Regions:
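Residues at alpha-helix caps and immediate loop-helix transition turns in enzyme cores, especially N-
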Residues: 14-17, 98, 134
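A short, terminal or domain-edge coil/loop segment
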Residues: 32-42, 88-94, 140-142
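Pocket-forming structural segment of enzyme catalytic cores
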Residues: 49-132
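Acyltransferase
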Residues: 129-144
């Protein structure tokens, strides 16, 4: 499995390493390799596979916000459920790739979680952060 996490650059930046990583994502997808994306990784997967990422009109989204799992998702059953995610982003997915499934959204982030077939899963929120870690990052100026 592969994991792509956060970055200070944008998924739509025209940098050589981003272009190369998007090509790698397409190759992983073609070969049905497991891939998880978090924040920048979520956005980069969407961009690489035909979605769109833009700067959020509302600006930075920083904090803990409830996301709602969509009904009838293969992963989570038939009931809508809420869960909290820690967000720290100013870019967001505005159009999902054609073959993806929207799994969760929130008031502040319409595309909070995506799946593509059974091998790609991505989150806009930082599932790798706990609250104490996020507070520490905020205090030293690494968030927002």
């Amino acid at each position: 499995a592969y994991l792509i996490t956060g970055s200070k650059v944008s998924a739509y930046d025209d940098l050589p390493w981003i272009i190369e990583l998007k090509n790698f994502i397409r190759t992983l997808h073609q070969h049905q390799k497991k891939l998880v994306g978090i924040c920048f990784g979520h956005q980069l997967i969407a961009e690489a596979l035909g979605g769109t990422v833009e700067r959020a009109k509302e600006g930075w989204n920083v904090g803990i916000h409830a996301a709602t799992l969509k009904k009838n998702t293969v992963l989570f059953g038939s009931a809508e459920q809420e869960f909290n995610l820690i967000y720290n982003h100013q870019d967001q997915v505005t159009k999902i790739p054609q073959e993806s499934k929207l799994l969760a959204s929130s008031r502040t982030c319409p595309v909070a979680m995506l799946a593509i077939e059974n091998h790609i899963l991505s989150f806009q929120g930082h599932i790798e952060f706990d609250v104490a870690y996020a507070k520490d990052l905020l205090q030293i100026g690494l968030l927002g």
